[in-house]
Amino acid sequence: AVSYACRVFYHFAFFGPVPTFLLMALVTVTAFALAIRMDAQVVAVLGMLGGFLTPVMLSTGEDNPLGLFGYITLLDLGLIAVVRRKRWDYLIGLAMVGTVVLQIGWWGKFFVAENIVIAQRVFLGMPLPFIGAFAWAVRRDWLNRWVTVAAIIPPLVALGVSFALLFTGDLAARPGALFTVVFGADLLLLALVVLKPSLRWLESVGGGLVFALLSLWTLGKLSGDLLSWAFGLYITFALLHTVFPAVLRYLRPAEVAPTPLWSQFFPALSLFLILLP
């Protein structure tokens, strides 16, 4: 708060954007270290709030996704380290919420269709620290609802944003760029199922959302010159969700129940999509 006041209200010469940002980041790191040393959860929460508010309060109004999300990634990794050390599991859920809010904020303020590659990295890259924490938790037997929810929500957000991307600029005419986000998020959900087969319901959720996106694109945006893309996407969808149950049984033979009937619907849905054009 003092650093912010020195820059915004008092306009001290030293407190330019970069020095103020670095100082506030240092305060956040120090707060995490003190929280661990003093076993003080309040300090950790305050440090986290300061960390996520730093890029908001010091925004220059210019788009800098590398700086923003590089910083947020480091902040998330720091919070995950604190959670792993002290088992303050709710912090990882709060970190996920802060990350998603900043993702949506960036998308709402700065995203244009020409930045789709950046959006791919933002919405497919930012879930990785939480999925990594989920994998570590499964391996070390400290998995809990906070870690699980923090890993599940970001890929679902990516799929949710994909519905908006479908109607943004000319992205519907660039299915390769658009459906990279869609299938990438679907793969992240399937990765969680591989790590924890009891989350198999995510396969149907992800597949259902991908089918909905493919259907909307087919009915509202598909043109004759995109037919080859359409058939390629349908086949990719069918193969992914047809092969996955077999892959899961191979990787987790002792933990996977017989293949549920609903998983056989995806090939049929793909055939339905082929009939739509």
Language model segments and positions:
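Extended, compositionally biased regions that are outside compact catalytic cores
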Residues: 1-277
